[in-house]
């Protein structure tokens, strides 16, 4: 099967692969706002994401979707696509790598998911919450969001607070960092031939991880 039919987070991956197959990775760009959600007892219950896709990919994704007003898609119009997105993301672990006190946390299937469309910027934003299988009180949480194969590029949204804590104990401290820019050695070409040799196990995209850390007493 074509690589890009299996390496997509939206149902239009085949179209995207055909249009961009000769180009280097990444093929999809996502800007995100992340929220870590706490219960009243101070336990961490899950992650709330808002991921905005680039305009080109959003255009592919909305092709063929009937809208009540041309060029304006409601949440109802986009509901089937949102469901497909969430189903596809499960295969990739929601591009989420999270540890508490050094131990990997298991994730449940997302809730409260929907897509919004911004007609001005012509982009889609996927909103969803990923609960932890077991809420946890932790002194040390580390979260990374990235695609191991770098098909998708994730970056924090350019706002004052791209990452927030919701309901966390007041003494908890949040820090986050962006990945460094990729440095390519002279003569090294990072086109499709290079990436076709990689698999998720190579974890090449880890160098582009957006890192979040929460320390609580």
Q: Language model features by range: what are they?
A:
Residues 101-217:
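Mature, soluble, non-transmembrane domains
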Residues 1-9:
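Bacterial N-terminal signal peptides that target proteins for export
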Residues 29-30, 90-91, 207:
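Short solvent-exposed loop/turn micro-motifs enriched in small/polar/acidic residues
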Residues 17-21:
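N-terminal signal peptide c-region/cleavage motif recognized by signal peptidases
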């Amino acid at each position: 099967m074509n690589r890009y039919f299996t390496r997509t987070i939206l149902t239009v991956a085949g179209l995207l692969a055909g249009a961009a197959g000769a180009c280097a990775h990444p093929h999809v760009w996502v800007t995100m706002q992340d929220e870590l959600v706490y219960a009243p007892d101070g336990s961490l219950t899950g992650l709330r994401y808002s991921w905005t896709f680039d305009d080109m990919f959003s255009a592919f994704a909305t092709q063929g979707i009937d809208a009540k007003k041309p060029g304006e898609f409601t949440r109802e119009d986009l509901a089937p696509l949102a469901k497909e997105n969430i189903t596809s993301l499960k295969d990739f672990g929601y591009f989420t790598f999270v540890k508490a006190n050094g131990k990997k946390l298991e994730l449940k299937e997302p809730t409260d998911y929907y897509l919004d469309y911004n007609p001005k910027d012509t982009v889609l934003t996927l909103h969803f919450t990923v609960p932890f299988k077991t809420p946890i009180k932790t002194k040390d949480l580390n979260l990374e969001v990235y695609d191991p194969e770098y098909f998708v590029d994730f970056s924090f949204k350019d706002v004052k607070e791209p990452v927030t804590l919701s309901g966390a104990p007041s003494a908890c401290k949040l820090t986050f960092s962006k990945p460094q820019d990729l440095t390519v050695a002279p003569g090294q070409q990072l086109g499709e031939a290079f990436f076709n040799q990689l698999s998720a196990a190579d974890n090449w995209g880890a160098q582009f991880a957006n890192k979040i850390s929460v320390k609580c007493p």
